[in-house]
Curated annotation (Swiss-Prot):
PANTHER family to which the protein is assigned, alphabetical: ETHANOLAMINE-PHOSPHATE CYTIDYLYLTRANSFERASE
Disulfide bonds: none
NCBIfam families cross-referenced by the UniProt entry: cyt_tran_rel
GO terms, molecular function: ethanolamine-phosphate cytidylyltransferase activity
Similarity annotation: Belongs to the cytidylyltransferase family.
Superkingdom assignment: Eukaryota
Pfam hit, one: CTP_transf_like
SUPFAM superfamilies named in the record: Nucleotidylyl transferase
Alphabetic keyword roster: Cytoplasm, Lipid biosynthesis, Lipid metabolism, Nucleotidyltransferase, Nucleus, Phospholipid biosynthesis, Phospholipid metabolism, Transferase
One GO process term, biological-process aspect: phosphatidylethanolamine biosynthetic process
Misc remark: Present with 4700 molecules/cell in log phase SD medium.
Main location: cytoplasm
Protein's name in the database: Ethanolamine-phosphate cytidylyltransferase
């Protein structure tokens, strides 16, 4: 049977556990391999059972990982229960000629390269893996209770990184604005005319940015204020109480399709002079009746890791990370 592959369709797959800005960066780069106007990116996400068999217990369950990936600005469609070893027949089903992956090796339970077959078929494209961020690294910080201090050179994002993650759904055009502390200090200009009076604002530290947070952002953007732009203020807190750096939190939030602007190091006065609705993440008005927001919190995620502490310590040790 002849399969008609579409050059404007591309495939990426993965566990997308603790869907962080490294995953988002790979998704963004994959979207850029197809046309700005008509490109479509299919994100295949593995089941809990497949991950358990090939890699070990995921922290986030299938439903959480599917929906988090679906909330990514550059993901056109999530393909649930995609096989752990990339199958060209699945790519054919969605008319994708190529699969995109980072410049690292992913192996299955037998120690085989998950992309061996598609590489041999010439249907594999490589993008640059994001340095210094991984699910393994985040789990390591939870286990050791150690985070990077604000004085670390990689604690804050560069302007180049902010510009890269601020692009629109087509992965090229400008979209998100980025501010420092308040709206007077613009770091990145967005792709629309900004008016603070035409926005809704929510703040929080957005540590371990997860579907509980995203549920609330979706509610603000789609239900409570569908005619407003959504500004997210990412607050500074005692660094020892946050697991992720400001860079990791900001870039993760920028990748969310419900977000139109971000304020880095926001504080209580950042938006006080503006006549717009203001919220705080995690409050009842935002969490009520949310599929994920009613139960999923940073604290619950930490408990999941701690409840299987020995399992994750052993898994991380295999990757060269000792407690």
């Amino acid at each position: 049977m002849t399969v008609n592959l579409d050059p404007d369709k591309v495939w990426i797959d993965g566990c997308f556990d603790f869907t962080h800005h490294g995953h988002a960066g790979a998704i963004l780069q994959a979207r850029r391999t197809v046309s700005k106007e008509n490109g479509k990116l299919f994100c295949g996400v593995h089941t809990d059972e497949d991950i358990q068999h090939n890699k070990g217990t995921p922290v986030m369950n299938s439903s959480e990982r599917y929906e988090h990936t679906r909330s990514n600005r550059w993901c056109s469609e999530v393909v649930e229960a995609a096989p752990y070893v990339t199958d060209p027949n699945w790519m054919d089903k969605y008319q994708c000629q190529y699969v995109v992956h980072g410049d690292d090796i992913t192996i299955d339970a037998n120690g085989e390269d998950c992309y061996k077959l598609v590489k041999e078929m010439g249907r594999f494209k490589v993008v640059k893996r994001t340095y210094g961020v991984s699910t393994t690294e985040i789990i390591h910080r939870i286990l050791t209770k150690k985070s990077l201090p604000p004085t670390h050179p990689d604690y804050y994002p560069t302007t180049q990184e902010l510009s890269f993650y601020s692009v629109a759904q087509d992965a090229v055009s400008k979209h998100c604005y980025v501010f420092q502390r308040d709206l007077d200090n613009v770091l990145v200009n967005g792709g629309y005319k900004f008016d603070a009076e035409d926005c809704v604002y929510v703040d929080g530290d957005f540590d371990l940015f997860h579907m509980g947070d995203i549920d609330q952002l979706r509610k603000l953007k789609m239900d409570l204020h569908p005619d407003k732009k959504l500004i997210v203020g990412i607050t500074t807190s005692d660094y020892s109480s946050t697991i992720m750096t400001m860079k990791e939190r900001v870039l993760s939030v920028l990748s969310c399709k419900y977000v139109d602007a971000v304020i880095i190091d926001a504080d209580a006065t950042s938006m006080s002079q503006y006549n717009c609705e203001k919220y705080h993440i995690g409050t009842a008005v935002l969490t009520a009746a949310g599929k994920f927001s009613e139960y999923l919190t940073k604290e619950l995620i930490v408990k999941r890791v701690e409840s299987q502490r020995e399992v994750y310590i052993a898994r991380n040790q295999k990757k060269g990370m000792s407690i």
